[in-house]
């Protein structure tokens, strides 16, 4: 009917229909969630090409990585037109977005910088490679990402006066104390305290900017970060004095193989799960020659104890995760971060989308036995 009224082509039809398909994610009633694809592992594709592929694979939207050509922080921070153009690309393929991600720049904020960082950092952050200067430039860029995210979300088609889902930047923090994880040479708590103090000092101004822009920062709890399990996540949160803009991008794949209860993580931080990755891993495999630390082997080496798998093919119990997310009232997207060195990525991303969509469900709105009561009959 819209086409008959004069919309000139399919792109216009999609752009007109797109805002009508949004729902209020702050509603007390949790609908089955949008399934999105994190674009970080697809940065070799242009955003238009990836958007077309994601739509074909059945995705509802994209979580835009701040590398490749998917999302340019510097442009988005100053240009409304650039943000609108990003949305037009998404809308042309019937896609939406709820988050952007800055893992690579975030990694450099607290890390002990070495030559490996040059490969993942933009030239304006790496500069001449002086470690402390790199950390400071990374901090400034991450703070700017809050403004870029706010501009992008404000340009969302059909957006009302408020965000339909709290604006969020997912990312890493790096860590000045990760190298001491094994506590040898003997390491006391004072040494680790200094690491958390360093994190708080560097992230304090960043979180101030996130508060100014009304954007959340969601740390993906992950080895090499200031928080990599439940205990260190609690400590990181305490270090920033519970700053309301600091929370977590939940990802079970980085917890399970460590022996961390990845469902308990959700229940431990019910008001700090700002975003959720659906990513799978298996553990307890290999030939017994490689342990949890990886043995300096590459992913997919058959000797490995653990590896990332296409969603649904690993050892993560996603049923338990969905129940826990429902219990805490998480109403945001389920964003698939796809990694599996043994599988074609297009096949894997398509099957992962199908798996997650089939698994997700809307919580019950009434007690299952309420119909026994005569007043309800």
Predicted stretch roles:
Residues 54, 62, 90, 100, ...:
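Conserved, mostly hydrophobic/aromatic
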């Amino acid at each position: 009917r819209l086409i008959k009224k004069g919309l000139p082509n399919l792109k216009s039809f999609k752009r007109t229909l797109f805002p009508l398909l949004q729902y209020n994610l702050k509603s007390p009633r949790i609908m089955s969630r949008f399934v999105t694809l994190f674009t970080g592992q697809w940065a070799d594709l242009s955003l238009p090409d990836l958007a077309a592929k994601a739509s074909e694979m059945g995705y509802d939207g994209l979580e835009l990585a701040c590398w490749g050509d998917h999302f340019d922080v510097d442009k988005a921070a100053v240009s409304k037109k650039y943000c609108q153009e990003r949305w037009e690309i998404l809308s042309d393929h019937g896609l939406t977005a709820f988050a952007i991600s800055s893992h690579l720049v975030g990694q450099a904020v607290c890390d002990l910088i070495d030559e490996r960082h040059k490969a993942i950092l933009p030239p304006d952050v790496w500069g001449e490679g002086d470690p402390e200067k790199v950390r400071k430039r990374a901090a400034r860029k991450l703070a700017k990402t809050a403004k870029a995210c706010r501009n992008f979300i404000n340009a969302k088609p059909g957006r009302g006066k408020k965000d339909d889902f709290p604006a969020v930047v997912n990312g890493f923090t790096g860590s000045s104390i990760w190298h001491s994880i094994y506590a040898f040479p003997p390491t006391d708590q004072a040494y680790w305290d200094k690491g958390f103090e360093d994190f708080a000092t560097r992230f304090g101004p960043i979180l101030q900017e996130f508060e100014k822009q009304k954007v959340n920062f969601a740390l993906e709890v992950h080895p090499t970060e200031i928080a990599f399990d439940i205990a260190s996540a609690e400590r990181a949160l305490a270090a920033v004095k519970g700053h309301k803009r600091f929370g977590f991008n939940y990802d079970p794949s980085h917890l399970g193989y460590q022996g961390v209860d990845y469902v308990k993580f959700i229940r431990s931080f019910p008001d700090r799960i700002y975003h959720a990755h659906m990513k799978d891993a298996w553990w307890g495999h290999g030939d017994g020659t490689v342990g949890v630390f990886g043995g300096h082997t590459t992913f997919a080496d058959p000797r490995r104890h653990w590896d990332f798998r296409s969603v649904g093919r690993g050892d993560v119990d996603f049923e338990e995760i969905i129940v826990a997310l429902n219990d805490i009232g998480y109403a945001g997207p389920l964003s698939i971060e796809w990694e599996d060195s043994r599988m074609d990525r297009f096949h894997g991303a398509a099957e992962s989308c199908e798996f997650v969509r089939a698994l997700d469900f809307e919580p019950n709105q009434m007690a299952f036995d309420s119909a026994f009561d005569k007043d309800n009959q």
